[in-house]
């Protein structure tokens, strides 16, 4: 993926995350639940003082430090490995985008705005950036696993 496309994709993904959070805050009261796809997904507004899926509540200094380290390392890795396959680039793009999206909330608000509730399973409320991070990490693990198995 060319550097320009990577940067534009990063900006777009972070913007989508921030716009989704802005929309939730503007249209749903704190703690209110509104069905989006009845029985499947509801939207709610939650202020999360923890990490993805509400773990490690009230440890902001820890999350800021970890976020800076992970994003910094991902950018360093991209810069020093210019010929990564598209899947690793996509994984790192999602991880960086998700990290930046939640980092903006932490710096601006001291909490992260969460809004997606899966009605069909007992699961934490999460946001778009959490989704980026989750998919990015899963994709990276698959890439690394494939490398180990096949030497790619």
Curated annotation (Swiss-Prot):
Transmembrane segments: 5-25, 61-81, 84-104, 125-145
GO MF assignments: aspartic-type endopeptidase activity
Reactions catalysed, as given in the entry: Release of signal peptides from bacterial membrane prolipoproteins. Hydrolyzes -Xaa-Yaa-Zaa-|-(S,diacylglyceryl)Cys-, in which Xaa is hydrophobic (preferably Leu), and Yaa (Ala or Ser) and Zaa (Gly or Ala) have small, neutral side chains
UniProt GO cellular component terms: plasma membrane
Entry keyword annotation includes Oxidoreductase: no
Claim: Cell membrane is one of the keywords in the record: yes
Subcellular location: Cell membrane
Pathway: Protein modification; lipoprotein biosynthesis (signal peptide cleavage)
Role description: This protein specifically catalyzes the removal of signal peptides from prolipoproteins.
Family: Belongs to the peptidase A8 family.
Name of the protein described by the UniProt record: Lipoprotein signal peptidase
